[in-house]
């Protein structure tokens, strides 16, 4: 149960949160529903301190035409700001979108799906896509109940499956006989797409929003395709490749096959405008790859009494990758809503690591790359320093350069990119 006016009065929210904290109940996770304009960063921080783990914002549509039809106003600027603020506080924003209103055309649905992708680019969010529901007493009900049909079960049609995961025949008979009473089990035809296609979008497009929002948005721009059309093509491509019935999509499907689909679609584009698409795809692939393994960070110390014989080994859960473009700059532009065509090529080294539920991506220089590569679990730090000195230590004494290597290893170890290997003792005495 959730109260959808919980944040309507700021004073009430603050009082509630302070009382929860005062009574020591903030270890109990809770969820709420909110308007975008009834919270701000300080309130969100207080809610998180009081135990709020997730909240739902009703976005509904990214189409101005559709928003006018349902008499709702959404400030896009506030939307993206609030999503970023909510996620930054450690609260997962659930964003509710609706597609398939009776007057909607392809462009209207494209606007909504594009908005969903942009929220996915901002970071950790939970997209929820639904089809319109006919509820008694609403204008939608009064205008369209007579054209309603039964094709697919939507969110509000679930909960009556009492016969091995299916509805009783008697329940089905009642729903069919009294559409005005059981209107939430009915669908509204939409000229843009069939109800079956809309249901596929509602069911599976959130996976793309979570895993590949950047690449998918770029792919739609490069191919000049409607986002929904492109997604349906992806599902059909996957169905043909896996020879699987019925049409479905899993997180594993996305990770294993979306890259191939992207490459095939891009190969059909005669004039490529954004040569950095494959860098963005690789960035999202590596983000998912490191997320599969989340080992606890180990305590890292160096015995300074035997520093020259210290051996470090790169954490196998950390991944290094060189990109052809400055991917962090491109992603910052994406988050600001800029999807420009051209960037100057610029080699960029990134290091990926997952710690608990947080993805860490840091930019490194060539020295750090080579240092990590030489930390193989066998070579003592003195040997690593000697091998790097010729390229990176020309303006330093060997002792000063060795000290800088020690400092770098300590930092990388504390951040979880290096682990302690064995130690080779007596090296100084033997030499």
Positions of predicted regions on the chain:
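Long, low-complexity, charged/polar intrinsically disordered regions in eukaryotic proteins
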Residues: 302-357
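Glycine-rich Rossmann NAD(P)(H)-binding loop
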Residues: 2-6
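Short conserved micro-motifs at the rims of enzyme active sites and ligand-binding pockets
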Residues: 139, 331-334, 362-363
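Rossmann-like AdoMet/SAM-dependent catalytic core
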Residues: 214-236, 240-247, 263
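Short beta-strand motif preference
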Residues: 55-57, 351, 381
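Long, charge-rich, low-complexity alpha-helical segments
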Residues: 241-304, 356-431
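Residues that form or immediately flank small-molecule/cofactor binding pockets and catalytic motifs
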Residues: 35, 132-134, 323-325, 355, ...
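A structural motif corresponding to the C-terminal lobe/cap of the Radical SAM core domain
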Residues: 10, 17, 21-219
């Amino acid at each position: 149960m959730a109260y959808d006016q919980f944040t309507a009065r700021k004073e009430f929210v603050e009082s509630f949160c302070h009382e929860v904290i005062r009574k020591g109940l903030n270890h109990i996770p809770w969820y709420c529903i909110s308007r975008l304009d009834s919270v701000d960063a300080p309130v969100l921080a207080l809610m998180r301190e009081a135990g709020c783990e997730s909240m739902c914002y009703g976005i509904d549509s990214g189409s101005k035409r559709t928003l006018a039809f349902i008499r709702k106003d959404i400030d896009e600027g506030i939307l993206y700001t609030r999503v970023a603020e909510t996620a930054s506080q450690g609260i997962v924003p659930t964003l509710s979108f609706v597609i398939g209103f009776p007057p909607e055309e392809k462009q209207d649905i494209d606007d909504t799906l594009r908005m969903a992708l942009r929220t996915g680019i901002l970071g950790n969010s939970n997209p929820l896509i639904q089809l319109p529901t006919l509820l008694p007493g609403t204008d939608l009900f009064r205008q369209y109940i007579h054209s309603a049909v039964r094709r697919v079960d939507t969110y509000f049609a679930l909960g009556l499956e009492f016969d091995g995961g299916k509805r009783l025949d008697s329940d089905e008979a009642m729903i069919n006989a009294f559409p005005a009473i059981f209107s939430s089990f009915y669908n509204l035809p939409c000229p843009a797409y069939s109800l079956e296609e809309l249901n596929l979008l509602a069911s599976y497009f959130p996976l793309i929003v979570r895993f590949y929002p950047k690449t998918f948005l770029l792919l739609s721009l490069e191919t000049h395709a409607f986002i929904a059309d492109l997604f349906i093509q992806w599902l059909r491509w996957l169905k043909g490749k896996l020879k699987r019935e019925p049409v479905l999509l899993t997180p594993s499907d996305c990770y294993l096959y979306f890259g191939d689909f992207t490459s095939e679609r891009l190969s059909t584009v005669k004039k490529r405008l954004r040569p950095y698409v494959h860098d963005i795809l690789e960035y999202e692939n590596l983000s998912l790859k490191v997320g599969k393994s989340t080992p606890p960070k180990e305590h890292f110390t160096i015995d300074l009494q035997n520093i020259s014989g210290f051996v470090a080994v790169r954490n196998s859960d950390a991944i290094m990758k060189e990109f052809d473009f400055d991917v962090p700059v491109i992603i910052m532009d994406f988050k600001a809503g800029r999807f420009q065509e051209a960037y100057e090529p610029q080699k960029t080294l990134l290091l990926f690591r997952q710690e608990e539920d947080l993805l860490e991506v840091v930019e490194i220089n060539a020295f750090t790359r080579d240092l990590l590569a030489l930390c193989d679990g066998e070579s003592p730090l003195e040997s690593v320093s000697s091998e790097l000195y010729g390229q990176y230590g020309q303006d330093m004494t060997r002792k000063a350069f060795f000290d800088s290597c020690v400092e770098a290893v300590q930092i990388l170890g504390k951040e979880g990119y290096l682990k302690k290997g064995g130690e080779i003792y007596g090296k100084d005495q033997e030499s």
